């Protein structure tokens, strides 16, 4: 999934240009204060690149899931269409200003910001209000998305996407604007995200372990099915583990279980065996009779959960086993917590996995990738995020990428001019499943693909023939 086939911001001319940057500033806000600015900080390199090169930035983002007004709705007497205080980006504007060390203008209506954009000078920054205040942003109708995109595109000259977190959305700001402008470039964050996922999906250092957790097997079916053909080890935790354990005939007490997915769990375990993937499930558990915090939760001595109890975290023996598995690997990708880590009494398993990955990365060169969402939050809370190779900003996007799906927000970006032998490697941008034929340079051929191997063979044969003829001629001359 290397960006060699998509143009990056380094390929764009931004001097004296107004650069529309789609960022993902969907950050947690409480009482008007941002509680985690990781996504904002992650976008800074792209913003700073434009400012340094003599361009101006027009930042576009969403926050939350506001209801959204229609473009055709009349403007209210006070305020702007679609406005919801809980989803305003004003606090984000203040935080970006602090991080950049300069004033950031704020346009209170993203579709009535032409006057703000026209006043921009080189090295200025403008943040538009939440693009989801308009329903057209995520409309299922292409013509509605395009109508909004045309307005936004009129503000700028160049489009850059740095919003991997929404790359799985076909929206006005992700796919509509680059379509209107006729070009789209990847920002540094987008580039980093795709390059890391490319390595882990196409040609990772081995052994490779996938650590999968969360509540439901049904949420991870496609991920598991797609990854089983790529990994060496599968570590399962979280509530979804108990569907697998019941499928194996284990007692799970009153732990969460998807009864209608038991056959699916059996099928996935069988498929793992057929593909020589070693699966690890919890061997002990931290339990309680209710779904709430406890001063002294029960820690089981066996793999079975007692009647009347629900498992809410993995136990100490399981932690040790999972740490050992991670320790023997060269690559690890993590998607989903091991327990209810939001409650301190059930956080040890999740934090132990985070620590094992962080330590492995720093001391043993482990390539560690956190697949966004709850896993990213857990890595931050544990203090291990800084030690990982990569913590993704995209929960849903990373999940769909791991499932082998197309990411519209990546596919729309402009192709880079490359030689014919690289042009067919579409999976590099999440637009198909990898195959040795379609992606020879990244799918296992040590010489870079069958076509290249054939060319090398031709050259070697020609050299051998030349040597043979040369020797025959030399022999004749000597005689």
UniProtKB/Swiss-Prot annotation:
Biological process terms in GO annotation: glycolytic process
GO terms assigned for molecular function: ATP binding; metal ion binding; phosphoglycerate kinase activity
Cofactor(s) in the UniProt record: Mg(2+)
Binding site for CDP: 214, 219, 238, 336, 341
UniProt superkingdom: Eukaryota
Reactions catalysed, as given in the entry: (2R)-3-phosphoglycerate + ATP = (2R)-3-phospho-glyceroyl phosphate + ADP
Compartments (UniProt record): Glycosome
Main location: other
Pathway assigned in UniProt: Carbohydrate degradation; glycolysis; pyruvate from D-glyceraldehyde 3-phosphate: step 2/5
InterPro entries listed in its UniProt record: Pgk_euglenozoa, Phosphoglycerate_kinase, Phosphoglycerate_kinase_CS, Phosphoglycerate_kinase_N, Phosphoglycerate_kinase_sf
Residues binding AMP: 215-216, 220, 239, 311, 342
EC number in record: 2.7.2.3
Binding site for ATP: 215, 220, 239, 311, 342, 374-375
Pfam families linked to this entry: PGK
A single cellular component GO annotation: glycosome
Keywords: ATP-binding, Glycolysis, Glycosome, Kinase, Magnesium, Metal-binding, Nucleotide-binding, Peroxisome, Transferase
Chain sites annotated for binding (2R)-3-phosphoglycerate: 23-26, 39, 61-62, 64-65, 132, 168-169, 216
Coiled coil region boundaries: none
Annotated positions binding Mg(2+): 215, 219, 374
Quaternary structure and interacting proteins, as annotated: Monomer.
PANTHER family reported for this sequence: PHOSPHOGLYCERATE KINASE, PHOSPHOGLYCERATE KINASE 1, CHLOROPLASTIC-RELATED
The family this protein is said to belong to: Belongs to the phosphoglycerate kinase family.
Protein name from the UniProt record: Phosphoglycerate kinase, glycosomal
């Amino acid at each position: 999934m290397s960006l060699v086939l998509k143009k990056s911001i380094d390929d764009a001319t931004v001097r004296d240009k107004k650069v529309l940057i789609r960022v993902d500033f969907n950050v947690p806000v409480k009482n008007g204060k941002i509680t985690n600015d990781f996504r904002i900080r992650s976008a800074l390199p792209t913003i700073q690149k434009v400012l340094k090169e003599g361009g101006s930035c027009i930042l576009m983002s969403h926050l939350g899931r506001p209801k959204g007004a229609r473009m055709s709705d009349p403007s209210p007497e006070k305020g702007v269409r679609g406005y919801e205080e809980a989803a305003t980006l004003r606090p984000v504007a203040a935080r970006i200003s602090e991080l950049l060390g300069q004033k950031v203008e704020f346009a209170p209506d993203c579709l009535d910001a032409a006057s703000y954009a026209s006043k921009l000078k080189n090295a200025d920054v403008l943040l538009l209000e939440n693009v989801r205040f308009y329903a057209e942003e995520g409309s299922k109708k292409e013509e509605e998305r395009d109508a909004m995109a045309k307005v936004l595109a009129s503000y700028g000259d160049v489009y850059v996407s740095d919003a991997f977190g929404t790359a799985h959305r076909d929206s006005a700001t992700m796919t509509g604007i680059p379509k209107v402008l006729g070009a789209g470039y990847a920002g540094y964050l987008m580039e980093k995200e795709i390059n890391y996922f490319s390595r882990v999906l196409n040609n990772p250092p081995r052994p490779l372990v996938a650590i999968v957790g969360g509540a439901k097997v049904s949420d991870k079916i496609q991920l598991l099915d797609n990854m089983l053909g790529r990994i060496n080890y599968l570590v399962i935790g979280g509530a979804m583990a108990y569907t697998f354990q019941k499928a194996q005939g284990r007692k799970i007490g009153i732990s969460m279980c998807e009864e209608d997915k038991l056959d699916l769990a059996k099928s996935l375990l069988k498929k793992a065996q057929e593909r020589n993937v070693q699966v690890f499930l919890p061997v002990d558990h931290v339990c309680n009779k209710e779904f709430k915090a406890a001063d002294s939760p029960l820690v089981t001595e066996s793999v079975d959960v007692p009647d009347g109890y629900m498992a809410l975290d993995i136990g100490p023996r399981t932690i040790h086993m999972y740490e050992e598995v991670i320790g023997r690997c060269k690559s690890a990708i993590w998607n989903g917590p091991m327990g209810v880590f939001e409650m301190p009494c059930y956080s040890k398993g999740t934090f132990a996995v985070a620590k094992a990955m962080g330590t492995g990365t720093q001391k043993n060169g482990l390539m560690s990738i956190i697949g966004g969402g709850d896993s990213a939050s857990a890595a931050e809370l544990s203090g291990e995020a800084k030690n990982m190779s990569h913590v993704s900003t995209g929960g849903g996007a990373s999940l769909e990428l791991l499932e082998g799906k197309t990411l519209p927000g990546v596919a729309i970006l402009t192709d880079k001019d490359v030689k014919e032998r690289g042009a067919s490697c579409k999976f590099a941008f999440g637009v198909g499943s990898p195959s040795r034929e379609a992606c020879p340079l990244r799918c296992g051929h040590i010489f870079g693909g069958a076509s290249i191997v054939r060319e090398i063979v031709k050259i070697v044969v020609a050299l051998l023939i030349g040597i043979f003829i040369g020797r025959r001629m030399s022999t004749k001359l000597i005689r």
